[in-house]
């Protein structure tokens, strides 16, 4: 039978461990975002082709699925995390150059960055302070993700601007939901590996940014 003192001690230890994971996650996340930004600016300046960007994305996906599962619990996991986020950031070069060349393009990019930051900070702060359990969203989010991927693949051949806007809007909602879900997992002690947590949150932010950029880009073209 657990004594009150033992229960309080265990609760304190869990809280300290959770706070440590949160602190390490957000510190590493900030470093990976800086790495991605530098890589993106470099590939924008170089002017890499979409084919090169695709190769970089495929290499990053390979690291995510085949390297990270083995390295995530070791110090090499940190190295691979920066390689992964560097490749993902660098792959944004052609897309960012495309939007930058549009009328008011730099403003659109800045707006997308600002909105992404506001959404992420707002949702994270709400989840951390409320400690609400968002695990109930899991099935809805993964179903939404599958729908977004399938719809995006179909629209490659259809080429509908309206469909693109709808897909980007749903995608923004889905990845906002994933921010709530993943933050909740850390707060509730379900995610204890800060490298894994960082990668999940990084992908949420990246996809939220690209979704918002698409939405703002389409709206800017219609003005």
Curated annotation (Swiss-Prot):
One cellular-component annotation, GO: plasma membrane
Keywords: Cell membrane, Membrane, Transmembrane, Transmembrane helix
Pfam (any one): Bax1-I
GO molecular function: calcium channel activity
Cellular localisation: Cell membrane
Lipid bilayer topology: Multi-pass membrane protein
Chief site of localization: membrane
Positions of transmembrane segments: 25-45, 46-66, 78-98, 105-125, 140-160, 161-181, 199-219
The family this protein is said to belong to: Belongs to the BI1 family.
Identification of the protein by name: Uncharacterized membrane protein VC_1358
């Amino acid at each position: 039978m657990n004594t009150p003192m033992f229960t309080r001690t265990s609760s304190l230890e869990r809280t300290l461990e959770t706070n440590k994971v949160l602190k390490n996650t957000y510190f590493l996340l900030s470093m990976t975002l800086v790495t991605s930004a530098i890589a993106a600016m470099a590939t924008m300046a170089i002017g890499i082709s979409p084919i090169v960007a695709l190769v970089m994305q495929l290499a990053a996906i390979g690291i995510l699925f085949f390297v990270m599962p083995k390295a995530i619990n070791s110090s090499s996991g940190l190295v691979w995390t920066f390689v992964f986020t560097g490749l993902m950031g660098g792959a944004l070069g052609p897309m960012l150059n495309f939007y930058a060349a549009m009328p008011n393009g730099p403003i659109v990019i800045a707006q997308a960055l600002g909105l992404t930051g506001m959404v992420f900070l707002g949702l994270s702060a709400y989840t951390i302070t409320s400690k609400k359990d968002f695990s109930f969203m899991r099935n809805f989010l993964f179903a939404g993700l599958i729908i977004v991927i399938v719809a995006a693949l179909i629209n490659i051949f259809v080429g509908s601007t309206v469909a693109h806007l709808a897909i980007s809007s749903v995608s923004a909602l889905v990845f906002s939901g994933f921010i709530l879900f993943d933050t909740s997992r850390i707060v509730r002690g379900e995610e204890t590996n800060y490298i894994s947590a960082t990668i999940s949150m990084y992908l949420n932010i990246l996809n939220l940014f690209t979704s918002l950029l698409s939405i703002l880009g389409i709206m800017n073209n219609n003005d």
